């Protein structure tokens, strides 16, 4: 796969990036080098290789997933000037 100058112009227009003609030629060359590298990577046989999530083998500590109200109701409603039954009271805005 390769990129031509028209594709670079179209992508730069879509990305709202202004490019001069000499920059279009440079970007075309650079993008083709990058795509060549990606094609090289796709040719590597990785069958049987487990995905690597970390360089160091680690086990994450898990906590029990339980639903709570956080026991923060009093702290939250303390921020409101007027409350009733743990709800914020506000002035009527629309009639």
Curated annotation (Swiss-Prot):
What's the domain of life for this entry?
Answer: Bacteria
Q: Which InterPro entries does the record associate with it? A: Asp/Glu-ADT_sf_sub_c (IPR036113), GatC (IPR003837)
**GO BP of this protein:** glutaminyl-tRNAGln biosynthesis via transamidation; regulation of translational fidelity; translation
Q: Its Enzyme Commission number? A: 6.3.5.-
Kindly state which reaction or reactions the protein catalyses: L-glutamyl-tRNA(Gln) + L-glutamine + ATP + H2O = L-glutaminyl-tRNA(Gln) + L-glutamate + ADP + phosphate + H(+); L-aspartyl-tRNA(Asn) + L-glutamine + ATP + H2O = L-asparaginyl-tRNA(Asn) + L-glutamate + ADP + phosphate + 2 H(+)
Gene Ontology MF: a single term: ATP binding
Could you list this entry's UniProt keywords, alphabetically sorted: ATP-binding, Ligase, Nucleotide-binding, Protein biosynthesis
Q: What EC class is this?
A: ligase
Listed disulfide bonds for this chain? none
The record's comment on protein family reads: Belongs to the GatC family.
Q: What exactly does this protein do? A: Allows the formation of correctly charged Asn-tRNA(Asn) or Gln-tRNA(Gln) through the transamidation of misacylated Asp-tRNA(Asn) or Glu-tRNA(Gln) in organisms which lack either or both of asparaginyl-tRNA or glutaminyl-tRNA synthetases. The reaction takes place in the presence of glutamine and ATP through an activated phospho-Asp-tRNA(Asn) or phospho-Glu-tRNA(Gln).
Question: Which NCBIfam families does its entry note?
Answer: gatC (TIGR00135)
Subunit composition and interactions = Heterotrimer of A, B and C subunits.
User: How is this protein named in the record?
Assistant: Aspartyl/glutamyl-tRNA(Asn/Gln) amidotransferase subunit C
Gene name, Swiss-Prot/TrEMBL: gatC
């Amino acid at each position: 796969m390769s990129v031509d100058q028209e594709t670079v112009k179209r992508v730069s227009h879509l990305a709202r990036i202004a490019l001069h003609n000499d920059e279009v030629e440079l970007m075309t060359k650079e993008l083709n080098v990058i795509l060549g590298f990606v094609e090289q990577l796709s040719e590597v046989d990785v069958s049987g290789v487990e995905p690597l999530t970390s360089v160091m083998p680690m086990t994450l500590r898990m906590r029990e997933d339980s639903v709570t109200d956080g026991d923060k109701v009093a702290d939250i409603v303390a921020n409101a000037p007027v409350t009733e039954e743990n709800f914020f009271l506000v002035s009527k805005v629309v009639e």
